[in-house]
Design a protein with these regions (language model features):
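A short, polar/charged loop/turn motif at coil->beta-strand junctions and beta-hairpin connectors
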Residues: 14-16, 46
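N-terminal functional modules and adjacent low-complexity/disordered segments of proteins
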Residues: 2-3, 74
Length: 122
């Protein structure tokens, strides 16, 4: 019982886990990319590792875009991980934590900034 309470208390202090909402804006135009209102649901998968389930809002409904596994560097306040689809690498996600806000972007494999991301924890 004490261990369960300790684990629950620790989970509430996790600065990364939870629901994040904001914008994901295209930086490469023209491209198939669209500016989006996004919701990220973030859960721990291992110590300092998280899974981001990414959704975009379409006509008021959440449309699942995919999952991204990221690693958190608490000293730097940074999250990062590879982005891919069907086993094909599509680039890197890099976000910086500042209080209840994550900002950063997604780059293509050649390093070109593809999306600017700015989300706030709900």
């Amino acid at each position: 019982m004490i261990i369960a309470a300790f684990l629950l208390a620790g989970a509430t202090n996790d600065p990364i886990s939870g629901t994040w909402e904001g914008s994901s804006l295209c930086q490469v135009k023209p491209s198939p990319c669209h500016d989006e209102h996004v919701i990220y649901r973030v859960k721990p998968s291992a110590p300092r590792h998280y899974r981001i389930d990414a959704y975009k809002l379409v006509a008021g409904h959440e449309d699942f875009m995919g999952a991204i596994d990221v690693t958190f560097d608490p000293a730097a306040g940074r999250l990062g991980g590879a982005v891919g689809k069907s086993g094909r690498p599509m680039g890197q996600l890099r976000l910086t934590l500042e209080n209840t806000r994550l900002t950063g972007g997604m780059t293509q494999p050649d390093g070109t900034l593809y999306r600017l991301i700015d989300v706030t924890k709900r």
